[in-house]
Amino acid sequence: MIPIVPVPGAAPAPAPSGGDNVGLWLKPGQISLPASPPLSLYVHVPWCVRKCPYCDFNSHAAPDGSEIPEAAYLDALRADLEQSLPLVWGRPVHTVFIGGGTPSLLSAAGMDRLLSDIRALLPLDADAEITMEANPGTFEAERFASYRASGINRLSIGIQSFNDEHLQALGRIHGGAEARAAIDIALRHFDNVNLDLMYALPQQTLAQCRQDVETALSYRTSHLSLYHLTLEPNTLFARFPPALPDDDTAYEMQDWIEARTAEAGYRHYETSAYAQPHREARHNLNYWRFGDYLGIGAGAHGKLSFPHRVLRQMRYKHPATYMTQAMAGNAVQEARDVDAAELPFEFMLNALRLTDGVPASLFHDHTGLPLHAIRRELALATDKGLLDPDPSVIRPTELGRRFLNDLQEIFLKS
């Protein structure tokens, strides 16, 4: 999963080149962090077989009739990571997420090289969760066995639906039969598998939504991600909106999903995430708890904490530009020191997605700001019935989860 990143309130400063200017980030600043948050690594593979009309991620259709420039891109990823090392020196990496795009376009040898480079350059935890996204249209049994042997230990499969008509409407390259076959292959080699599905699809009925979810539940995978389809700006669907279920039907779908997944033994622990006991996505939990993540690859975002500041980075988005810049020692297009006034909203934007919320102490631990900096907002949200009144936690109520945007906006400074 790509992290939720708020739109910056000001134009970013010119990016320092990699870790050459690490001294800039160690100078005194507006905040005081007691310790570094946990660190994750996000790796972006930008190519897809075809761009989906609803997708606003940094993904690019692979050149027709040609292979992706795998070797050159892996060279660039290693160069990018090497340039970033001074910013994270000595910090253990707890999770890795290889997203896209479609990372399963990488060959078995390419994935093995990528993971070998990561292990050679970073102190990866022995039990690190290493997730790879995969598209059912790119599944080959032998290749996925090799991915597992290389060290991938969690697979996230972009199913979206098992209904052929809905898959066609979404512009997916696979059908329902391919989706089922992909899950069968995955479960032969992986015991930690997430299925991505969407609901409130074009022309979808409640009965069809139920059928999709029941099919997913029948596989008893460790994790499900169930997303309400939204029309994102700068997508084909935004320009040519399809006919979607009305709000009442979408809410009925959501209520049924929550009840049915709970009945099946899945815990709804985050806005769109459902897990069997102790099988939550550790990488995504680090995002939602406002942990740190180094992002490498075309268009990848990163958040890194220092004693007196929080740094956000973004790599060059176009794959060709990214590869050129990374090999020249300057993969980072934008970098900025997050203003202390923005940190409360950034923290809450993520933490309030969690059903259990977070310990109140985590606000200071991960923003470097005292909790009383948001006392008025906490009081207002509590008075509105959107936050649990327990002062030891920051936890949304059932009403707060239902009206999450309203709850988050309370913490948005004008």
What name fits each language-model region?
Residues 1-42, 90-91:
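N-terminal [4Fe-4S]-dependent radical SAM core
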Residues 25, 31-40, 58-369:
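C-terminal scaffold of the Radical SAM
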Residues 44-59:
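Local cysteine-cluster metal-coordination motifs and their immediate loop/turn environment
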Residues 383-392:
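A short, conserved structural fragment
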Residues 399-414:
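Short, amphipathic alpha-helical interaction segments positioned at domain boundaries
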